[in-house]
Curated annotation (Swiss-Prot):
Heterodimer of HisH and HisF. One of its GO terms (molecular function) is glutaminase activity. Its EC number is 4.3.2.10, 3.5.1.2. SUPFAM superfamilies: Class I glutamine amidotransferase-like (SSF52317). It is found in: Cytoplasm. It catalyses: 5-[(5-phospho-1-deoxy-D-ribulos-1-ylimino)methylamino]-1-(5-phospho-beta-D-ribosyl)imidazole-4-carboxamide + L-glutamine = D-erythro-1-(imidazol-4-yl)glycerol 3-phosphate + 5-amino-1-(5-phospho-beta-D-ribosyl)imidazole-4-carboxamide + L-glutamate + H(+); L-glutamine + H2O = L-glutamate + NH4(+). One of its GO terms (biological process) is L-histidine biosynthetic process. IGPS catalyzes the conversion of PRFAR and glutamine to IGP, AICAR and glutamate. The HisH subunit catalyzes the hydrolysis of glutamine to glutamate and ammonia as part of the synthesis of IGP and AICAR. The resulting ammonia molecule is channeled to the active site of HisF. It comes from Haemophilus influenzae (strain 86-028NP). This is Imidazole glycerol phosphate synthase subunit HisH. The lineage of its organism: Bacteria, Pseudomonadati, Pseudomonadota, Gammaproteobacteria, Pasteurellales.
Length: 199
């Protein structure tokens, strides 16, 4: 059985992420224990709230260096994906610098912010997270900040402007949407992370 650990970032959506894995039949544990995090097979970095509050929590829990040195697969969700980049304009805070890119506020194009609801996702590179998921499938988003498309983007979406819906580099993967709120496609993505992403 794969040992899946949800990193306790002190944010609000930890239990909903855990329930999503429970529904798929996977055992998960929410923790900020450094030894449990280091020994996990796969890790989830969830996030809801602001980048500066999340980085403060990670610093207080001595998790920043631990996360930066992980060699097993890590999936960042929503703010968790944004924390994987170099810097967030939200609070003007340096983030984990796991994947190049910056997180910026979505520009005003007349659409309401935050983006809240279903949006189409276009895969631009092969990625095991999306195995069996149809191109241009819909996923559920809630966000006002986003990562511009770059060389690490594996999927993009559009909300007035294009942005990275998913990024990946080495063992680090991130999705801007909430798979735990994205129905069968989100469930399949989480299953793919457990069963298809190598470790």
């Amino acid at each position: 059985m794969t040992n899946i650990t949800i990193i306790d970032t002190g944010c609000a959506n930890l239990s909903s992420v855990k329930f999503a894995f429970d529904r798929l039949g996977y055992n998960t544990e929410i923790t900020f224990d450094l030894n449990k995090i280091k020994s996990a097979d796969k890790l989830i970095l969830p996030g809801v709230g602001t980048a500066n509050a999340a980085m403060y929590n990670l610093q207080e829990r001595q998790l920043i260096e631990t996360i930066q040195n992980l060699t097993q697969p890590v999936l960042g969700i929503c703010l968790g994906m944004q924390l994987m980049t170099e810097f967030s304009e939200e609070g003007n805070v340096p983030t984990l610098n796991l994947i190049s890119g910056k997180t910026n506020r979505i520009p005003d194009t007349g659409l309401p912010l935050p983006q809240m609801g279903w949006n189409r996702v276009q895969f631009v590179k092969n990625c095991p997270l999306f195995d069996g998921i149809v191109q241009n499938s819909h996923f559920y988003f809630v966000h006002s900040y986003a990562v511009s498309p770059n060389e690490h983007s594996v999927a993009i979406s559009n909300y007035g402007v294009n942005f990275s819906a998913a990024i990946a580099k080495e063992n680090f993967y991130g999705v801007q949407f909430h798979p735990e709120r994205s129905g069968k496609n989100g469930a399949l993505l989480l299953k793919n992370f457990v069963e298809k992403v190598p470790f």
